[in-house]
Amino acid sequence: RRDSQGGKTVAIADCEPDVQKLEPLLVEKGRTVVVKLSPMLDIFSSLRELKYIRQIHVVAVNNECKELLVVLQKEIKSPSEGSGEVWVSCEQAVNNFLTEPFVFTYSQEKEAQCPLAGEVENYLYEPGASLLKAGPYRLLGTRFGVKKLHANSHLYTSDTLVDFPGRRFRVLEVSGFGKKELKQLLQGVDKANLTVRNFPASVAELRKKWKLKEGGDVYLFATTL
């Protein structure tokens, strides 16, 4: 999963052994082959480069993407796979407890319609790491009845709390990015957990600007509505 210089690789062709070259032999020798890939690899590139992928499992532990597993089969094994579509399973373990997998296909994601929120409601949701990696962003909205804050933010909101597969927050205050508004919002806050989604500044830049230390009980999200 690393090259000879110790750098992380992001393409199958950069990895050793070269699974793309070995794939015909693998599916010839084994009816079902599971290949463990680097979580740094792009899923859509993997789908283009590997011909016999039937399933993809994206595994996260304590909200960090750890494994990208692909199941290779030369022949389709069950009627449910008759369309030849690849099933993607997002699996998350938190404190040694495995949550319910989120299973989907990319055609389902393409057809899904997720409403956009006109404003931030009572609760805010951030998808778990495996979901952010796999990208079922529209389906999350339709399956859990939540709204996206923005088409490109991947943050969701709702009036009532739902059992969402990720981090869930009760919204206490919403502020614009104006100097006066921010001063009021950050009054008495010198430490906070800061997340940036679809925003023209990095976490490091905002920490420096707002003079915030990392950690504490306050969670701040900088995003575009």
For the regions a language model picked out, list residue spans one by one:
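SAM-dependent transferase fold signal centered on methyltransferase-like domains
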Residues: R1-L225
